[in-house]
Regions:
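Short, acidic, metal-binding catalytic loop of nucleotide-sugar glycosyltransferases
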Residues: 210-220
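Acidic donor-binding loop at a coil-to-helix junction in glycosyltransferase catalytic cores
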Residues: 103-112, 365-372
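Active-site microenvironments that recognize anionic phosphate/pyrophosphate groups
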Residues: 435-560, 564, 571-578, 583, ...
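A conserved acidic beta->alpha catalytic loop
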Residues: 28, 227-236, 255
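Conserved donor NDP-sugar-binding/catalytic core segment of glycosyltransferases
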Residues: 28, 33-65, 289-322
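A recurrent flexible, glycine/aromatic-enriched loop bordering the glycosyltransferase active site
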Residues: 64-88, 329-350
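Glycine-rich, basic loop-to-helix element that forms the pyrophosphate-binding segment
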Residues: 2-14, 253-271
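Short beta-strand-to-loop acidic/aromatic patch adjacent to the donor-nucleotide binding site
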Residues: 16-30, 273-284
Length: 648
């Protein structure tokens, strides 16, 4: 497969020049005059990892311009349009491939360009440098749903994996930890409001409004229509429908509002309900139960936003391709990360009004819904409904049925910018969070060793014991041992703890939060709690415990252990297995110790087993036996560890 990692490896192996040109189509390519020289020139001027260019497309014998857009950090869509001619810096290409351990069938090229973008620029040359033959003649409104086509599911799984790995590498990944939503924080006259922005939709608005008013619910609701100065008779239709007092017809005083601005008028209306629910003026709800299902989902899934499933129909509401759009690629844990890769989140959308009022809707007529999804999912869980509750009507009057390339580029540029802003916030937030956690850890240690009597006494005692350290030197055969020894009687409880199954079952777990001393405070980090160890061996000694009672096992936790070396940079991490003397083999935990205690510089007799550019593995056999792994990056370290772990 052209897009596979295997294909990328083959290209790297056969590339023996400074630059590598990749053509991604199977049709004829016509290179423009001095086009390759121009691409090389820009590559050298910018030191880019890859350059791409505007071009021409030949469709049914007719040549058309095909401009593309600049690449941004948020240009994470796997279908980002670079055109078919990509010129790579061969060294950058090879370096990425040499360090790539994943094997993708479909996401190889996508993974490659993400990894190149981590170290080098991807530069757009806004000059027309070649002509390609375009065989995909579908309209833009048809192409946009390719990623939700069930036959492409395996492709999307790989693309999500590659994107998620990229986000983790650059600090843009969000772990599945969400802020709770308090639905009792505000009071409302109405439980829900259906929000319908409209301008000049005389053919469809009556269907939309009646669909909303016909909803059967157990709660009071209304319909707020923001009529954005219609001139085709839409306003008159709405006035006729206003005999139903549940319909609120609003004509804004402002004349500079897009769809997002109309939404702001609706959600800030004094009669707006607790939940604001979307209904476009072209569309209708599937039946009279849709609104009830949406509101029930808020309470069941405890979320700040709900997105449903819709079916594409023609004007007469008969199903048309691509049919049902359910966005089953969304997962509760990784949905908000994968949202940076895809171009839409689904419909209909509904929001908890207090949060939406706080965020406010961007005053645009494209992408405002996607912007809200990114913003809300940054902090809150998004709920999903996978049954069809909404009919999206496609007809010649739709604003997005068949767009010219300039409009497509404008839309994609805006969504890429939304993703870039979100990504920049995530990276900055993570850097700030790490700094705050590091400061909090130091404050926790100072506070606990001053105010918690047990910790205070034992750390003071440790200083006294260490002041009586004894040095011993002795030959063991041909090996000479230098050691420092000190007594530490405060650790007697840990070293003599009974760790057999019967003893463990007969005692409460002392690492579980409910069983720990009230004085023992902690810092939460994802699914762990960082505690000051009250029975220290080291000058600064922490225990990092799982929030849940889970058995001590390094399997599946080694990546966490590596991550804590970033969070606690002044410490080294220890893991003591259940069969290696751990006093709490029934509760997963690590130890963190200040680096002045480290064993760096000590002599070990070792044998190198593997030593290459990526990893060094050696066997150390004096004064005790262990395997040392030194790796170029975290991914290689983790993979190497698990290979050895599985063998042992």
């Amino acid at each position: 497969k052209m897009q596979s990692t295997q294909a990328m490896r083959a290209i790297a192996e056969h590339s023996d020049k400074t630059y590598t040109l990749l053509y991604t189509k199977h049709t004829a390519l016509k290179i423009g005059m001095f086009a390759l020289e121009r691409m090389v020139q820009v590559m050298e001027m910018t030191q880019a990892g890859m350059v791409y260019a505007d071009h021409y497309q030949q469709i049914d014998g007719v040549q058309k311009t095909a401009p593309v857009i600049d690449y941004q950090p948020g240009s994470l869509r796997d279908d980002f349009n670079f055109g078919s001619g990509l010129l790579f810096n061969a060294n950058a290409f090879k370096e990425v491939i040499e360090n790539t351990e994943e094997e993708y069938q479909y996401a190889g090229l996508y993974d490659l360009r993400l990894k190149i973008s981590q170290k080098s620029k991807l530069v757009h040359i806004n000059e027309y440098l070649y002509t390609e033959v375009e065989s995909d003649k579908r309209k833009s409104g048809e192409k946009q749903f390719d990623y939700v086509d069930p036959k492409n599911r395996q492709v999307q799984i790989e693309m999500e994996q590659a994107c998620t790995n990229h986000l983790k590498e650059i600090g843009g990944y969000l772990y599945p930890i969400f802020r709770p939503v308090d639905f009792s924080s505000h009071t409302f006259e109405y439980e829900a409001s259906v929000i319908i922005p409209v301008r000049n939709r005389i053919r469809t608005v009556k269907d939309a409004v009646r669909s909303a008013l016909n909803q059967q619910t157990t709660f009071p609701f209304n319909v707020i229509v923001i009529d954005n100065h219609s001139t085709d008779g839409t306003s008159e239709v709405l006035r006729e429908l206003s005999s139903d007092k549940r319909l609120i017809h609003v004509i804004p005083e402002r004349n500079d509002l897009g769809i997002g601005g109309c939404w702001n008028i609706g959600i800030h209306h004094e009669k707006c309900g607790k939940f604001a629910v979307q209904l476009d003026s072209d569309d209708v709800y599937k039946d009279e139960h849709s609104l009830q299902i949406i509101i029930d989902t808020f309470y069941k899934q405890k979320c700040a936003m709900v997105i449903g499933t819709y079916m594409m129909t023609n004007f007469d509401m008969q199903e048309i391709a691509p049919g049902i759009i359910d966005h089953k690629e969304w997962t509760p844990d990784n949905g908000r990360n994968n949202a940076l890769r895809i171009n839409g989140l689904g419909a209909p959308r509904a929001f908890y009004t207090p949060i939406l009022r706080e965020i406010k809707v961007p005053n645009t007529s494209y992408g405002e819904d996607y912007a809200l999804g990114l913003k809300i999912s940054h902090d809150y869980q998004i709920g999903r409904i996978y049954d069809v509750i909404y009919l999206c009507r496609r007809w010649e009057g739709n604003s997005d049925a068949a767009l010219p390339v300039e409009k497509i580029n404008q839309n994609n540029l805006y969504k890429d910018r939304l993703r870039t802003w979100e990504l920049e916030q995530r990276i900055l937030q993570q850097e700030t969070t790490l700094e705050k956690i590091q400061q909090s850890i130091e404050r926790l240690f100072q506070k606990q060793t001053l105010s918690w009597e047990l910790a205070k006494e034992n750390y003071q005692a440790l200083k006294q014991y260490r002041s009586r350290t004894k040095e011993i030197s002795k030959w063991f055969g041909k090996q000479y041992l230098d050691a420092n020894l000190f007594l530490n009687p405060k650790r007697i409880l840990s070293t003599t703890a009974q760790t057999d199954t019967a003893s463990i079952h007969s005692r409460p777990c002392f690492l579980c939060q409910t069983n720990r001393p009230q004085e023992q405070e902690f810092i939460s980090y994802r699914n762990y709690q960082i505690l000051v160890n009250p029975y220290p061996i080291f000058k600064h000694h922490f225990t990092i415990v799982d929030k849940e009672h889970k058995s001590q096992s390094i399997a599946g936790r080694f990546k966490d252990m590596i991550e804590f070396t970033d969070i606690m940079r002044e410490y080294f991490l220890l893991y003591n297995g259940p069969e290696c003397g751990a006093s709490a083999p029934d509760h997963a935990h690590f130890q963190a110790c200040s680096k002045e205690e480290s064993m760096q510089g000590s002599y070990y007799d070792h044998i190198d087993l593997i030593d290459n550019d990526k990893v060094r593995i050696s066997y150390e056999d004096f004064p005790y036996s262990f395997i040392r792994i030194q790796a170029k990056n975290k991914k290689t370290m983790s993979k190497t560890f698990h290979l050895i772990y599985d063998i042992l």
